[in-house]
A protein has these predicted regions:
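ATPase nucleotide-binding head domains, primarily ABC-like/P-loop NTPase cores
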Residues: 79, 83, 94, 214, ...
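Alpha-helical coupling/stalk and coiled-coil linker elements that connect catalytic or binding modules
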Residues: 1-266, 274-275, 279-303, 326-327
């Protein structure tokens, strides 16, 4: 189950107690910065961790200028003056070398500190603590890292003269005594061994954020349901499904008992939008445990693949037809694994009618094997008769009354029975001679 599924009780509390949710969101918002995404780089990238021998060398070099100055005062030997100058020069080089390395962390380290700080506040709330009961111990284990990272001087706003003077003297101390270089080296020793715990905190904070977002998202929907598993005899079921991005979307219902779905109908009638609604609902069910329907039931572990809006590629030298051929080939390969939901729209538009119908029939028969479910739309009503034993047939249709074209967007059983494409051209003001010639051509082609 997804992380959302196992935390439905928390979602229920967030939905019923909006004041609590608002308070939690105020804490979450404190990490609402474009630099926050850079925290992920601390979890995966290779970091400039100094070797222990180099770290010990830094500890020795930080005392060379002071020791040289002391020995110069005691002995008055010019050699110790040269040693002090060389030591200061070496420390200066090492300081700026380390400072250059740390520029890559100018954004991520401050945001990591902010993440740890805000996560500690969230962990004090019983509801948030129930997201990850181990998080308190993890945060406690990161206190030493947090203190070490807090010593970073990753940059400072020089807003007035006093701050400028303070920064100048601090930078001198860091340059000559390697304070910053040593501190950052020790911090990255700690960081390298704490990445898994940092990732756990990152996931904790992110999951709390997601739960609040899902709670608000559900409230914005006209209605929703939780996904379920198919009842006996069912292979797929959805009741009153709608697309969340379509205002006043007309809902539709379909239940399958072993077959797939082939949808016919004219353009703009709702075929593609319905198929997209199925895909969006299944994705939301898997990721957010939220369905845009009164009820939504599908087989456990069902995976989604679609070929709805494909384009040619000039850069890759692929035509629309070749792009579609390669995509459908991948889907056929996936179909052998079984338990897939395939969504297809207008198969093989880039070839002639006879071969398009023949190829589409063969492909659609192949895809439904191994317990796969297919939702496909087509203008080729010939496919309905070829696939009637393997697919449940549905259609969308338009209404033409008094020269006005309208759609009800309701899914209806059976294949489409009327052809209104030429009628739509007439309504849209095409020249009458074009319309009449089209009607004549229909009669001729139907006799071929």
């Amino acid at each position: 189950p997804s992380a959302i599924t196992v935390h439905e009780d928390i979602l229920h509390t967030l939905s019923s107690d909006t004041t609590l949710r608002s308070d939690i969101q105020k804490e979450l918002k404190k990490l609402n910065h474009s630099d926050a995404c850079s925290i992920a780089s601390l979890l995966s990238a290779d970091h400039p961790v100094s070797s222990h021998s180099f770290y010990r060398l830094l500890r020795v070099l930080q005392f060379v200028p002071v020791l040289s100055l002391g020995l110069l005062y005691v002995t008055s030997s010019v050699w110790f003056l040269w040693l002090m100058l060389v030591g200061l020069l070496v420390n200066l080089i090492l300081h700026y070398r380390k400072k250059t390395e740390m520029q890559a962390y100018l954004f991520s380290v401050p945001q990591l500190l902010n993440l740890l700080k805000q996560s500690e506040k969230l962990a004090k709330r019983p509801l948030c603590l129930s997201v990850d009961k181990e998080i308190t111990g993890v945060l406690a284990d990161l206190i030493s890292l947090r203190k070490r990272l807090a010593s970073f001087r990753m940059g400072i706003r020089l807003e007035n003269d006093l701050v400028l003077i303070a920064y100048f003297f601090t930078e001198l101390l860091n340059m000559f005594f390697l304070l910053e270089a040593i501190s950052t080296s020790r911090a990255f020793f700690l960081l390298q061994g704490k990445q898994q715990k940092i990732e756990q905190v990152f996931r904790f904070f992110g999951l709390v954020d997601v739960l609040c977002s899902v709670s608000m998202f559900r409230e914005s929907l006209p209605y929703h349901s939780l996904p379920g598993r198919c009842r006996e005899g069912e292979s797929f079921h959805v009741a009153d499904i709608y697309h969340p991005l379509i205002d006043h979307c007309v809902s539709n219902t379909v239940t399958l008992h072993g077959k797939s779905v082939l949808i016919t109908g004219s353009n703009m009638s709702g075929k593609t939008s319905f198929i997209r609604s199925i895909g969006v609902c299944q994705l939301a069910a898997e990721a957010l445990n939220t369905c845009f329907a009164r009820s939504f039931r599908y087989p456990s572990g069902m995976r989604l693949a679609s070929a709805i809006h494909m384009e040619d590629s000039l850069l890759e030298g692929k035509s629309f037809f070749l792009q579609e051929v390669q995509t459908i080939k991948e889907m056929i390969d996936l179909s052998r694994e079984g338990n897939h939901l395939f969504l297809l729209d207008e198969l093989f538009k880039g070839t002639n009618t006879v071969e398009r119908i023949a190829i589409a029939k063969a492909v659609l028969s192949a895809l439904i094997r191994q317990r796969n479910i297919v939702f496909v739309s087509t203008h080729d009503i010939e496919l309905a008769s070829l696939l009637k034993d393997e697919y449940d047939l549905y259609h969308f249709c338009e209404n033409v009354e008094n020269g006005v074209l309208s759609f009800d967007y309701k899914l209806k059983p059976g294949p489409v029975t009327e052809r209104n494409a030429i009628r739509i051209l007439e309504i849209c003001g095409y020249p009458q001679e074009v319309v009449q010639e089209a009607y004549s051509a229909v009669g001729q082609t139907s006799q071929l």
